[in-house]
Amino acid sequence: MIKIGNIELSSNIILAPMSGVTDLEFRRLVKRFGAGLVVSEMVASRAMIVESRQSLKKSAIMRDDATSACVQLAGCEPNVIAEAAKMNEGMGAKIIDLNFGCPAKKVVGGYSGSALMKDEQLAAKIFEATVEAVKLPVTVKMRMGWDDNTKNAPTLAKIAESSGVQMITVHGRTRCQFYSGNADWDFIRSVKESVKIPVIANGDITNFAKAKEALQKSGADGIMVGRGAYGKPWLISQIDHYLKTGEEKSAPSIAEQLDIVTEHYEAILDYYGESVGVPIARKHIGWYSSGLPNSAEFRGAVNLMNDPLAVKEKIAEFYTSVMETNKLKEF
């Protein structure tokens, strides 16, 4: 199993940090399905140190995951990131992850995220300041580089390792690719071969076969699942079972999915409150139902609803209708 500093993960499959997705309740759910590590949404370090309400929500720690709670920080000022890391350590985080991979224009425009890959000297200062500030393991998530002409992830990985960083995750695209094309898992092997600390492969890992291929091509110690987990918090459990046994584990039954969706929906309402929670839940409900019969009509109806009870009843009605449709197909 992967060791990050003195923390040993229960699985080599990790849930990626995703803005607007990996909030406390989604992380808790995916962790229950067997993820070795679940990473918070990206938290802006400067917002963190002024304790903005949004940043505190994003970095909230699962008290039932006290051994490996991981918070991802973004920013470009070494002292500010270090201070934010210390704050999160004080609030119970066990791992600090640094964001060197976000391709969003708003983020790179502030010289954060993947823009940091263009300045190796600044990157080194950020690594060193963060490692020195906390007693926790520090990790980093990066891309291959800024563009095809500057794929410097192996070099940056060496800098990170020499600065005391304990694990590196590489998304197999450049910043300029955003999410176009295919993730280059072969390139990640060059990062793995450049350092001795664990390296995690990320990008396009959406099913059993891709998980296995990503590990084989990259030689990585583990994989990080991102968008593939949209509406499928059980995917990590399926992949883990497949990699260990070679058997393709079925997704939960429709009845079981109804229970999962309902539980997640209620957890969102409890965490955010009904007025905020209902709009937040819509995207998750849409992802859960994608590919099921009449899902487009269902999503359209839910997106117009604001009453929490009405949404819950609609969820039950939809999944019940899917179960009935499936029964008819069996005859």
UniProtKB/Swiss-Prot annotation:
EC numbers on record: 1.3.1.-
Pfam families: Dus
Active site: C102 (proton donor)
Transmembrane intervals: none
Claim: tRNA-binding is one of the keywords in the record: yes
Record GO terms (molecular function): flavin adenine dinucleotide binding; tRNA binding; tRNA dihydrouridine synthase activity
Keyword 4Fe-4S: no
Cofactor: FMN
Residue numbers binding FMN: P17, M18, S19, Q72, K141, N202, G203, D204, G226, R227
Keywords linked to the UniProt accession: Flavoprotein, FMN, NADP, Oxidoreductase, RNA-binding, tRNA processing, tRNA-binding
Annotated family: Belongs to the Dus family.
Entry-linked NCBIfam families: nifR3_yhdG (TIGR00737)
Job description of the protein: Catalyzes the synthesis of 5,6-dihydrouridine (D), a modified base found in the D-loop of most tRNAs, via the reduction of the C5-C6 double bond in target uridines.
UniProt name for this protein: Probable tRNA-dihydrouridine synthase
